[in-house]
Amino acid sequence: LISFLWYAIYNQDNPNIYQYNEFGERMLNNFTLPQMITYLLITLVTTQLIFGSSSSFDNVSEDIKEGNIAMQLIKPINYRIRLLSNSFGSMLGTFFIIVIPISTIEIVTLGSIFGFGKLFFSFNWYNILFGFISAIISLIIYDTLDFIIAQLTFFTGASFGLYLLKASIIEFLSGSLIPLAFFPSWAQSFINFLPFAGIISIPNLILMG
């Protein structure tokens, strides 16, 4: 649905809202329609891979609410490293069980509609390699934010509201909902000082070249 929404946006009758590249293609904030569809496709995959893999928020908040945090901390294993290792294990499982099937369906569906060559205009081995490395770094950033925010359960006594607040802020500021290029320039300058862009936006742009 989001893909077709952007398709409608790029096909408005008012040509004055667009820029044009050297090939005469319509652009919004330096994104052509195929580039935007590609960004959305990659975003769906990376959000599943990153957001669906981190379990630190749930684990920490549950340990705090159930009073098990003290027992976890005195065990002869680093609590933070154990949580991060769990997230990496989940990331590996998510990649094979969810990401590969979703990617296949997306490629076949959107590629048949908009054209395979246009969607994957800049994929090459080094973009994929550095994109994979950036995805690992993204998981570390996101998992660390999960770990820090979950500790607020000490003061709130409940975690559901914290989870909704965290999810809303991160999805909005990470480029998961819309590319950060569509934000005002002053907002982009502010967001660049925050870690959120490194979760979704930067890995996506690396993959796109």
Give, region by region, the residue ranges found by the protein language model.
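Alpha-helical transmembrane segments and their short interhelical loops
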Residues: 91-159, 163
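Transmembrane helix segments
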Residues: 112, 147-207
